[in-house]
A protein has these predicted regions:
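Helix-to-loop junctions at the C-terminal end of transmembrane segments
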Residues: 67-80, 162, 264-276, 361
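Intracellular juxtamembrane helix-capping segments at the cytosolic ends
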Residues: 118-131, 317-330
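Structural signature of the two symmetry-related core transmembrane helices
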Residues: 81-95, 279-294
Length: 407
């Protein structure tokens, strides 16, 4: 076995420093994002927000994803700008402590998700310029593990604080933690290659459409993720209207989901490095589909806990898979543009799905159970398309080297 040299150890120090700062920022995102995702819809529902209003709240991250097609012009171009944008997004949640109300909840949710959507293309390019490609999946898995662990702890503590101090105060405290942790990116030493070239909305879409593999995976994720997006507002109806759960119960569901995500991130990252990102998405989507079906029939909290575990395992596989597929299919120079195009294409379906299903439920056309089963049917289509995309990828690779894929 070759012993490590002084030069090899010195070469790892910049990566270790960057990884540490990345982890601090990821923890802050996990804390603030936990309460935005798990508690904010329930808080809004208890505040009187109707199903269509919940749909607006659920659509917020996808509208901002669609708008991130303009990130090439208005997104961060340095690590300091990156830190500022993430800090402002998390810090906006503090406003709930002073001006509570459903309108303010929707407004701060939009500000929070804008900060995430507009910074994610820069972040993916930053990772590509900072970390070696051979360890990309494990880096994403490591950071995801830290963020998911923070999410689990924040969901547990946040649920307890929400019951004692009130939901808006708990969310505001999480936003403060996220804003402070986002400052870690200001100390990130990135190479000049990390600064993306300016690109237009048209160029970001072109970067996606130029790669058939990305189009196939985006189509699959459109159906799979679309089913979960449509189901999002219905989850709050299950918690409040069907089962009348407390905020601490909802927080505990979030804890288990985040715990499942935490323990699975590194495993999915290793799978992505060993095979490819699509392998993680194929198997993870099957697990997530089972969790969505559980929600449709859940008679009580125990079944919801099982569903949360399944969905948590699935969400980490999708996140690792997306980063892996886009990185594998694009050179560093066009990676930020491709990520913006991905966000825009997948975000467009997020604008329609929650409103469609919430309207069907609110106007009495379907009940919550039927609505969730329709969502599961859409996600099941996405699962099938992930497997189809993998088969096409193998066929294309075989054709490129002159091998019969059926052999």
């Amino acid at each position: 076995m070759q012993r490590p040299t002084r030069e090899s150890i010195e070469g790892l120090r910049p990566i270790s420093r960057s990884l540490s700062l990345d982890l601090v920022a990821a923890i802050g995102y996990g804390v603030s994002g936990a309460l935005v995702s798990s508690l904010l819809p329930t808080i809004a529902r208890r505040g009187g927000l109707e199903p269509l209003g919940l749909a607006v709240l659920s659509a917020a991250p996808f509208l901002t994803n669609l708008l991130s097609v303009f990130a090439g012009r208005f997104g961060p171009r340095s690590t300091r700008q990156f830190a500022l944008l993430r800090g402002v997004g998390a810090g906006s949640l503090v406003g709930l402590a002073f001006v509570p109300g459903t309108t303010v909840i929707i407004a701060v949710a939009f500000v929070f998700w804008i900060s995430i959507s507009f910074s994610s293309p820069f972040q993916l390019r930053l990772w590509g310029a900072t970390y070696p490609g051979r360890m990309r999946g494990r880096v994403v898995g490591f950071l995801g593990t830290g963020r998911a662990a923070a999410t689990a702890m924040a969901a547990l503590v946040g649920g307890l604080l929400a019951d004692r101090l009130g939901g808006p105060t708990a969310v505001a405290m999480a936003g403060l933690v996220g804003a402070v942790c986002a400052l870690a990116y200001a100390g990130f030493r990135a190479s000049a290659a990390a600064a993306p070239l300016a690109y237009s909305a048209r160029e970001s879409i072109r970067a996606m459409r130029a790669r058939p593999m990305l189009q196939r995976v985006a189509l699959a994720q459109g159906f799979f993720g679309g089913g979960f997006i449509a189901a999002g507002p219905l989850f709050a109806l299950v918690y409040v209207d069907r089962l009348d759960l407390s905020l601490s119960d909802v927080g505990f569901i979030g804890v288990l989901g985040a715990a499942a995500t935490t323990i699975s991130f590194l495993a999915w990252g290793a799978i992505a490095d060993r095979f490819d990102g699509l392998a993680a998405m194929r198997y993870g989507s099957l697990i997530g589909l089972a969790g969505l079906i559980d929600y449709a029939f859940a008679p009580g909290l125990p079944v919801l806990l099982i569903a949360a575990l399944a969905i948590g395992l699935s969400s980490s596989s999708i996140e690792v898979g997306i980063a892996g597929v886009i990185s594998d299919q694009t050179p560093l120079a066009s990676r930020a543009a491709a990520m913006s195009g991905w966000n825009a294409i997948t975000g467009a379906r997020g604008l329609v799905a929650p409103f469609l299903m919430s309207a069907l439920v609110q106007f009495g056309i379907v009940n919550v159970t039927t609505g969730l089963l329709l969502c599961a049917a859409a996600s099941g289509t996405g699962v099938a398309l992930f497997w189809w995309a993998a088969r096409r990828a193998r066929a294309d690779m075989a054709a490129s080297i002159g091998v019969d894929p059926a052999a």
